[in-house]
């Protein structure tokens, strides 16, 4: 049995996805996104084994990762997603983008989750084993 630690870094902010909602539109329902945007918590997780703990008792100092996570969160909150990204910015595609952005700076990154708290739907992009 492999015993591992799992660490999660979280940031909460507002995003404006800006994509059409064909099902809601067909039923003449109002949009789900509030004027101020969806409230989203981004969760960034990484894992490591017991023998990877250093002499300070940690695998990595999470303070060192804050800059990368903050930069990613700021980009997601910086405007309407179709104006920010060159791809169709579904929550799935944006979670994958965030994972790719963070993978180079967060050792052993295992997932990035975008939890849309406004509508109660979370999308998690997970590294496959």
Model-inferred region functions:
Residues 1-129:
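Charge-rich, low-complexity N-terminal segments
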């Amino acid at each position: 049995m492999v015993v591992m630690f799992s660490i999660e870094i979280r940031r909460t902010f507002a995003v404006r996805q800006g994509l059409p909602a064909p099902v809601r539109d067909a039923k003449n329902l109002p949009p789900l996104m509030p004027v101020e945007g969806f409230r989203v918590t981004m969760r960034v997780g990484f894992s490591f084994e017991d023998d990877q703990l250093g002499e300070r008792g940690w695998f990595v100092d999470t303070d060192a990762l804050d800059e990368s996570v903050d930069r990613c969160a700021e980009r997601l909150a910086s405007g309407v997603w179709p104006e920010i990204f060159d791809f169709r910015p579904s929550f799935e595609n944006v979670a994958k983008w965030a994972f790719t952005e963070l993978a180079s700076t967060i050792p052993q990154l295992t997932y990035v989750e975008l939890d849309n708290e406004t509508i109660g739907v979370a999308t998690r992009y997970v590294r496959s084993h």
